[in-house]
Amino acid sequence: MGIAISINALNKTFRGGRKALHDIHLDIKAGEMVALIGASGSGKSTLLRHMAGLMAGDGAGQGLIQIHGQTVQQNGRIAADIRRTRAGVGFVFQQFNLVDRLPVIVNVLAGTLHRVPLWRSLLRWFTPSEVARGVEALRRVGIAECCAQRASTLSGGQQQRAAIARAMVQGARVILADEPIASLDPESSRKVMDILARVNREDQCTVVVSLHQVNVAIKYCPRTVALHQGRVVYDGPSVALTPTLLRELYGADADDILALGDHITSLQDNKPVAPHLVWPAALAARAPLASAA
């Protein structure tokens, strides 16, 4: 299985000298479903935006990001052909990023715009086969009956499912989801995560999802990458994450991750690692604690 996302020596410093990402090295295999966890401000969203080429890293270092072998950015410069690379990357935002006044189907078919002529994209004119593909994507996420409604009439969970359908219509080989369930109720959260897991499994689509709920990472993602103050402090099997380990990794900041009420009840310090859920053995053999130096 090849590498879908490769990140080497990525650093990001914001104005004022605040270091957001510290020397990130990360390889994600094609077809993996990986969780990014961390307290607020740990760098999860910043890292995802760099993966998508929406932000550029520091130019002074040797930072390099590639998706399926295509360069997204290098040495602080976004690749000149980034549009071609982005065509295979779906980004699911926390705030849905739909156009409220447009019908759901039109929002979903925005995923085809990179493949259609400019005049058709300006007129929002789609072929019957494109519309059929959009309706099928909406059926797969369970909201086909809403295709003619304005996006503004959907609930938060339905809007997030429409955003995933847009990535499916796009034909994305990689989906980057930035806290897609942060503002949703538990039932809507479950449906959204079930859909992401199904797309990962059925379409062999690589999924990287940032989460604030550790138990959700354990349930859906065999592998978890934990960030703390812009550094990777854990990269390994999700099932190995216990409250004790999280406190070791995060110290006082662990309260931000553990203070989730019922969300954390599935975490037990003596919970055995289920072999069928373990992250691939060749990678799991690596020491789970990354250097924070």
Swiss-Prot record:
Record keywords, A-Z: ATP-binding, Cell inner membrane, Cell membrane, Membrane, Nucleotide-binding, Phosphonate transport, Translocase, Transport
EC number from the UniProt entry: 7.3.2.2
Keyword match Nucleotide-binding: yes
GO molecular function term, any single one: ABC-type phosphonate transporter activity
Annotated ATP binding sites: G38, A39, S40, G41, S42, G43, K44, S45
Reactions catalysed according to its record: phosphonate(out) + ATP + H2O = phosphonate(in) + ADP + phosphate + H(+)
Subcellular locations according to the entry: Cell inner membrane
Highest taxon listed in the record's lineage: Bacteria
GO cellular component term, pick one: plasma membrane
UniProt xrefs under SUPFAM superfamilies: P-loop containing nucleoside triphosphate hydrolases
Membrane topology per record: Peripheral membrane protein
InterPro entries: AAA+_ATPase, ABC_transporter-like_ATP-bd, ABC_transporter-like_CS, ABC_transpr_PhnC, MetN_ABC_transporter-like, P-loop_NTPase
Enzyme class: translocase
Cross-referenced Pfam families: ABC_tran
Domain called ABC transporter: residue spans: 5-254
NCBIfam families: ABC_phnC
Protein purpose: Part of the ABC transporter complex PhnCDE involved in phosphonates import. Responsible for energy coupling to the transport system.
Subunit structure: The complex is composed of two ATP-binding proteins (PhnC), two transmembrane proteins (PhnE) and a solute-binding protein (PhnD).
Family, per entry: Belongs to the ABC transporter superfamily. Phosphonates importer (TC 3.A.1.9.1) family.
Name of this chain's protein: Phosphonates import ATP-binding protein PhnC 1
Organism encoding this protein: Albidiferax ferrireducens (strain ATCC BAA-621 / DSM 15236 / T118)
